[in-house]
C-alpha cells in the first residue's frame, strides 16, 4: 500500500508502466509516529483486513463519475479570448460514494450501494463498472436530473476547464421512500451502514433521520463521510 501526494504526472502510457514497475522501495517509509499514536501494528492491520470478507456493508450516497479529457492546445482563438484545444483522449472513473463502495468491495466485503442517477449513458457506464468492481449497485432512476458527471479538460498536466453536469436539489419523497425500502430489505444481514454525502441531493436530512431510526432499532453501526466537492 503506497501513499503519495497525488501530484505525479506522466506523459505517456509507457512512462506510467515503467514507473510502477520500477518503484524505489527505499523511498517508502512507515508513518511510525501515527502508528504509535493509534496503537497500530502491521499484524493488527492484517487481521482487520482479513475480517473485511466477513462484512456485509450498505453504502448510500451521491454517485459521481469523473472524466478526464486530455487535449492538445492549438492556441488562442482569433474571435474571442479563449483557448482552442483538440480532445485527444478521454478516461472515466467511478467517484463519490461509488468509489467508497468499490474500495470496500476490493477489500473483500459484500457491498450494497444505493444511489440515484439520471436515465443516461453515464448511468450505464456506472452500472457496468460497479458490477466489475463486485458492487451490488441499486441505482434508482430520477429523470429530473442527470447522472452526476464532472469533466476536466487538461493539457500538459494542467486543468484548462472543469464542467459539472449535476443537479443539487434534494431527491423526491417518492425516491426517499424507495431508498428506505431497499435498506429495510437487507438490514437484517447488514453489519455496517455508511453515509457518503457530497451534497448533491441524495441524502436530504429527512431521509437521513428516517434511516437512523431504522438503524437504531437494529442496533446497526453507522459511519458518515460528509463533504462538498
Residue ranges and their predicted role:
Residues 1-5:
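Conserved C-terminal "lid"/linker of ANL adenylate-forming enzymes
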Residues 9-11:
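N-terminal beta-alpha lobe that positions the nucleotide/phosphoryl donor
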Amino acid at each position: 500500500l503506497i501513499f503519495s501526494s497525488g501530484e505525479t504526472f506522466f506523459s505517456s502510457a509507457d512512462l506510467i508502466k515503467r514507473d510502477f514497475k520500477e518503484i524505489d522501495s527505499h523511498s517508502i517509509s512507515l508513518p511510525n509516529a501515527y502508528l504509535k499514536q493509534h496503537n497500530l501494528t502491521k499484524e493488527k492491520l492484517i487481521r482487520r483486513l482479513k475480517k473485511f470478507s466477513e462484512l456485509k456493508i450498505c453504502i448510500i450516497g451521491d454517485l459521481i463519475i469523473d472524466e478526464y479529457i486530455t487535449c492538445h492546445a492549438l492556441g488562442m482563438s482569433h474571435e474571442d479570448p479563449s483557448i482552442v484545444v483538440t480532445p485527444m483522449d478521454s478516461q472515466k472513473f467511478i467517484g463519490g460514494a461509488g468509489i467508497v463502495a468499490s474500495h470496500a468491495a476490493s477489500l473483500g466485503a459484500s457491498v450494497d450501494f444505493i444511489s440515484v442517477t439520471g436515465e443516461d449513458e453515464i448511468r450505464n457506464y456506472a452500472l457496468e463498472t460497479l458490477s466489475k468492481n463486485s458492487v451490488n449497485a441499486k441505482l434508482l432512476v430520477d429523470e429530473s436530473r442527470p447522472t452526476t458527471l464532472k469533466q476536466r479538460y487538461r493539457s500538459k498536466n494542467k486543468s484548462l476547464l472543469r464542467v459539472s453536469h449535476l443537479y443539487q436539489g434534494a431527491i423526491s419523497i417518492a425516491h426517499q421512500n424507495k431508498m428506505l425500502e431497499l435498506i429495510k430489505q437487507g438490514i437484517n444481514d447488514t453489519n455496517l451502514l455508511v453515509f457518503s454525502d457530497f451534497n448533491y441531493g441524495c441524502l436530504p436530512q429527512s431521509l437521513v433521520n428516517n434511516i437512523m431510526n431504522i438503524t437504531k432499532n437494529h442496533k446497526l453501526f453507522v459511519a458518515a463521510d460528509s463533504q462538498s466537492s
